[in-house]
Curated annotation (Swiss-Prot):
It comes from the Eukaryota. InterPro entries: PSII_PsbT, PSII_PsbT_sf. It holds the Pfam family PsbT. One of its GO terms (cellular component) is chloroplast thylakoid membrane. One of its GO terms (biological process) is photosynthesis. It comes from Bigelowiella natans (Pedinomonas minutissima). This is Photosystem II reaction center protein T.
Length: 31
């Protein structure tokens, strides 16, 4: 159970950082 919680927190932090960088700059990769 602890491993699942740690993986969830890791994915959550990476997701927040990714979305913050993605929405901060214009999406140049899609073009």
């Amino acid at each position: 159970m602890e491993a699942l919680v740690y993986t969830f927190l890791l994915v959550g932090t990476l997701g927040i950082i990714f979305f913050s960088i993605f929405f901060r700059e214009p999406p140049r990769l899609l073009k």
